[in-house]
């Protein structure tokens, strides 16, 4: 980037006097700018023409002259940054941000949040870490899950926790509920403006079924075909009334068969790097088009507290500033996460169900969750598994715990404090707790988990929480060691029975009963939930927190720069 190189050379020269006038010569300036004297003369001419400085040199080699700086490197960097953004080249603009945090904040503050560029609304979000991926079957973080749902579509999607049409507008099943037809919308388009065809979706599903997790999620799918250019058919080995939910699952989002970065959702991926993610509105989306033109994640960890690590403490911010300034902004939406951090016990020889219930009772009665040394307002002890599904208080006959137990746990970092609290609690009751930490966000591919007596982790719950809990038991490797046991076989039989219940409310009640058994049986104990919050600056509207702790980009909008501003209301 030639402009950035010129700016860096100018800054090296400016730093010799911190912007004050200098008596110097061409040779000395060339040494500071790390270039030839000939090139330095060219730079001086360009800088004078651009109004960056004035130079009065004496004729003759080695003669001194006076240089007067008219602009500071900071001003020029800000100007160049704005020019790059106005040109829609955020990736180039990011190269200008190699600055100390305190200077970076001043430079970025006016550029974050909602901006109008060339009559186009753009939303910029500072984020504390690089995005892992957008491939639906590779991601683990809630930010990545949210982003994937903006880029990719499935046959169905979730709206208010229920499956509704996405690529398909309606579906039906035969009388026996073994055959399901999903009717596709006409004129569907990929992000590359290529028509989306039923045959492509069938090929994608057949490929997905080779994936271990997808094969567990769609375990009862025998075949997929396209009996018509606007229809996709599934044949099942047994009735499964979760099928429309399953097809809206993250694992069933459908990338383009040749280019996995291309989807058919409301937003198309334009740039993905460790420094910047940019998505743009898909003009030919089959549902309501987004009101913004682009959303950018600027990966700026310098602006966030490094001590937070991978903590959920990082708020979903669309404004920038230090903590004091954030307190002056209005929190536009907040909620308690449906997802929770959990503790799972594995009853076996040497660790009986009575002992697991005793452990649950000790945790509940000790109140250690509410006393964890975490920032106030970050978590709240779990009282309900889901709204209306209360966590039962264990009232068991206390029995001695085993002399030693092994705990395996994963991220988030708040579980570090929980593990330390458990070590201290169990020590008081004659039990030594061996602790093994896995720096991962899910249990896929973690073989030593079979050795664990106790497991702690984070169960993210987005849309359709009842279905999410059903699929958790079916697809998470966390539960695999339980399945060969008599209790595990009973749970699997109950799950198969539940999926064949046609009525939604009856199906939900049956799953509630199953989870109640897991909690009272000393297998599952929800520990705590998180508090989500979004801060927004003036002018950014339509922001409402979703179950992933983010907001629907397609509903956000930015007030146009009208002077004077006028009040407005939603259309009837």
Can you name each region flagged by the protein language model?
Residues 18-21, 41-43, 140-142, 147, ...:
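Aromatic- and charge-enriched surface segment that lines or borders ligand/interaction sites
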Residues 19-28, 33-42, 51, 55-57, ...:
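Ligand/substrate-recognition segments at binding pockets and active sites
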Residues 48, 58, 358-392, 417-421, ...:
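Detector for C-terminal structural segments
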Residues 126-173, 570:
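N-terminal lobe/hinge region of extracytoplasmic solute-binding protein
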Residues 130-144, 194, 243-249, 535-552:
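A structural "hinge/loop" feature
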Residues 214-276:
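Surface-exposed binding/hinge segments that line
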Residues 280-283, 335-358:
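A bilobed periplasmic-binding-protein/Venus flytrap-type ligand-binding module shared by bacterial periplasmic
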Residues 284-326:
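Ligand-site clamp/hinge motif
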